[in-house]
Every structure is written in C-alpha cells, then in structure tokens.
Amino acid sequence: MAEGETKSPGPKKCGPYISSVTSQSVNLMIRGVVLFFIGVFLALVLNLLQIQRNVTLFPPDVIASIFSSAWWVPPCCGTASAVIGLLYPCIDRHLGEPHKFKREWSSVMRCVAVFVGINHASAKVDFDNNIQLSLTLAALSIGLWWTFDRSRSGFGLGVGIAFLATLVTQLLVYNGVYQYTSPDFLYVRSWLPCIFFAGGITMGNIGRQLAMYECKVIAEKSHQE
C-alpha cells in the first residue's frame, strides 16, 4: 500500500447494548404477532365449538356461520392473547420468580388441548343445572392451572383476567352488542369466568415458552460474539 493512501473506515458497528435492545424489541414484536394469530385461530375454533352444538359433521351452514358472526371477535381475542402472553413472562421477571415448571412445547400443546376440551365441555355436556356445570368447569380450570402452571403469579393473573373479561362481556351484552341463549349470571353464562381463567393460563404458558426460546437464542448469540 502506498504511503499517501489512507485506509477507508469499515462499516460502523453498534455497541453490544444497542444490539441487545434492538434484538429484544424485534423478538418482542415477533412474539406479539405469533400470540395474536394463535389467539385469532383459537377464537375461530372455539366459536365453531359453541355454534355446532349437537353437530358431529361440518355442514355448509355451520362453516358459513363462523364467517357471518361478528368480525371483531377474533381480532379482539388475538389482541388480548398477545397482551396476556407478553404479560406473563414480564411479571415473572419483575417478581424475580422465573417460571420453570414443565417448560417444554409438548406440555404447552397439552395445555391447549385441555383448554379446548374445557370449552367443548361447556357446549356439549348436559348437566341438571348450570351450577353443576359451572362448578365442574371451575374444577377443570383450576386443575389446568395446577397441572401446567402452579405459580402464584399465574393464578393471580388468571383470576384478574377472568374478572376483567367477564365484566367487559357483561357490558357488551348489556349494550346489545350480542347475547347468550340462556343467560343465568348477569346477562351471561355462569361458566364464562372459568373459560376466561383457563384461557389466560393457556396463553400465559404459550407466552412463557416463546420468551424462554427467545432467551436461549439471545444467550447463544452473545456466547458466539
């Protein structure tokens, strides 16, 4: 190289802190999008289970009824799922109690299956009265928490989610947005809080698993650097 020539500066590299913040923001956005679409999908599936009571096949009128129902329900469920799924690992970090119970995808998928089963039971199983149905679903929902979560923060958030979601649903029904066929608890069905509680636990488990995967990826990248 000649004496008069100067070495051109290479591309500017971001510091480790900026790179970490950027990657965390991107991962947070990706987790939110994934949770949103999972919530939308579950909302469509559970809506089908509620509509097709005593229907074993999928006739055209049942399929059409999914898309003719209120269009805003799946996006609202997706948004709520994203918020819940991001909130659970955030609360775990702030409490300093990382959730380590049954942290694998097979357990998460079983939790989703049990949640769908609880919803299916609410639509298909006939009881003598609604109190028996509500108590049974409450026991199943608490059993879901005990089997797949067992954290105090998870139980507390599940109860809070059930209360807020039931309150919002009551306000929507009261204002005539939609209605239940046989309301027995302040314009809604008495088993509804159990469904919301189980849904909060399920989305929390999915959010925790996604957050754990993100931590593994970040740790591997920092180790390579």
Curated annotation (Swiss-Prot):
GO terms for molecular function: oxysterol binding; protein sequestering activity. Keywords: Cholesterol metabolism, Endoplasmic reticulum, Lipid metabolism, Lipid-binding, Membrane, Oxidation, Phosphoprotein, Steroid metabolism, Sterol metabolism, Thioester bond, Transmembrane, Transmembrane helix, Ubl conjugation. The keyword Endoplasmic reticulum applies. One of its GO terms (cellular component) is SREBP-SCAP-Insig complex. InterPro entries: INSIG_fam. The chain crosses the membrane at residues 29-51, 71-88, 104-126, 130-148, 154-175, 190-207. The modification Cysteine sulfenic acid (-SOH) is found at residue 215. It comes from the Eukaryota. Signal peptide: none annotated. Belongs to the INSIG family. PANTHER family: INSULIN-INDUCED GENE 1, INSULIN-INDUCED GENE 2 PROTEIN. This is Insulin-induced gene 2 protein. The lineage of its organism: Eukaryota, Metazoa, Chordata, Craniata, Vertebrata. The gene is INSIG2.
